[in-house]
């Protein structure tokens, strides 16, 4: 389930807290939340607290710079701190990147190299 908040006009949108409540109500281990750090920051911030509160139902996270939605190496969110927080919470789900590259995708992967992620 992907909660996008009120900024995205979509019938299935929901706030993180609403999505977590719905997942708890469904009660199925294969229904998980996608926690998009970009949308969570836009919709109120407090990222570490909100992630920790709903960690048990999060199976996928997404990263992007706020507010530019470019590579996650600029802006309001400190992704080194976010990735440290994911490690401290023993997060074992997926990490996705949904952003608009400033140039070619390959040129913008410098941020990922510091985490041991490379191209080719």
Identify the function of each model-found stretch.
Residues 13-120:
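Histidine-acidic metal/acid-base catalytic patches
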